[in-house]
Regions:
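A short, N-terminal "cap"/entry segment at the start of jelly-roll beta-barrel domains
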Residues: 1-87, 216-219, 223
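Double-stranded beta-helix
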Residues: 2-3, 128-148, 175-228
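A short beta-loop-beta micro-motif enriched in histidine and acidic residues
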Residues: 78-87, 98-110, 114-115
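Short, conserved secondary-structure segments in the cores of folded domains
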Residues: 89, 109-110, 154, 162
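Conserved metal-binding segment of the jelly-roll/cupin
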Residues: 94, 152-179, 185-190
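Glycine- and acidic-residue-biased ligand/ion/polar-headgroup-sensing regions
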Residues: 94-95, 107-109, 113-129, 133-137
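A short beta-strand motif that forms part of the nucleic acid-binding face
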Residues: 105, 115, 125-127, 170, ...
Length: 228
């Protein structure tokens, strides 16, 4: 992805967060130059990949297959120094965009429609013996205190304010209808590592390759300099 594209997406994201009065921690407004002055007291941000994250899953087609997100808080499954057992993210999805089909081996999460248009989900049970197989079995849904079953791959609509619980080995994809508005999406989950706990149905990259065509407006969570 071109840096100019990433910069524009982050600015869009900031505008949407302001529109819905979702305030962010101070570190999310630091410039690249400010990051160069930060010492080890901010290692939790670096070590746990808190911050901005814009991805096209390595396919170069962000408008249809992409996601913008911010990890606001997280623990670290690989480092006992960080004892948080929970994580929080806020995401933005544009109309026509899909977050591609995947499951988590360990993470349980709630996805919340925080405002904008509708989110459309499709879920399948994964075959634990053959993880690349989508089972044709009914999927148990837990949504805002209600439990019920749907057919595999059946569409589930989340309107603003509604949420959906996703359990390990639940294949899930979600998208925003083309005639909708951008959607602000919350995630409350167990502590997790996106590098090791995403099983995509079709092999995909997690982070983009960045083409530097202009200076960075905000650093991505994979780009922080070493502590001074």
């Amino acid at each position: 992805m071109k840096r100019s594209k990433i910069n524009a997406i982050i600015k869009d994201f900031e505008k949407m967060l302001n529109e819905y009065k979702f305030a962010l921690p101070p570190f999310l407004s630091w410039t690249p130059e400010e990051w160069k002055t930060k010492g080890h007291e901010y290692d939790e941000i670096r070590d746990n990949a808190l911050g901005w994250d814009v991805t096209d899953y390595g396919e170069g087609n962000f408008e249809t297959k992409g996601l913008s997100l911010i990890t606001i808080r997280n623990g670290n499954v690989h480092n006992k120094k960080y004892t948080k057992t929970y994580a929080e993210k806020i995401m933005m999805l544009y109309p026509g965009q899909v977050s591609p089909n995947h499951f988590h081996w360990n993470k349980m999460e709630d996805i919340i429609n925080r405002g904008g248009g509708d989110i459309i989900f499709r879920l399948w049970n994964a075959n634990r013996e053959n993880e690349g197989e989508l089972l044709d079995t009914d999927v148990e849904i837990c949504s805002d205190g209600r439990r019920y079953f749907v057919k595999a791959g059946e569409e589930i609509t989340l309107k603003p304010g509604e949420s959906l619980s996703l359990y390990p080995y639940y294949y899930h994809e979600f998208y925003i209808p083309k005639d909708s508005k951008p959607v602000l999406i919350g995630e409350v989950s167990m502590c997790n590592d996106d590098n090791t706990d995403n099983r995509f149905y079709e092999p995909l990259g997690r982070y983009p390759t960045v083409e530097e065509d202009e200076p960075a407006y905000r650093l991505l969570c994979t780009e922080y300099p070493r502590a001074v």
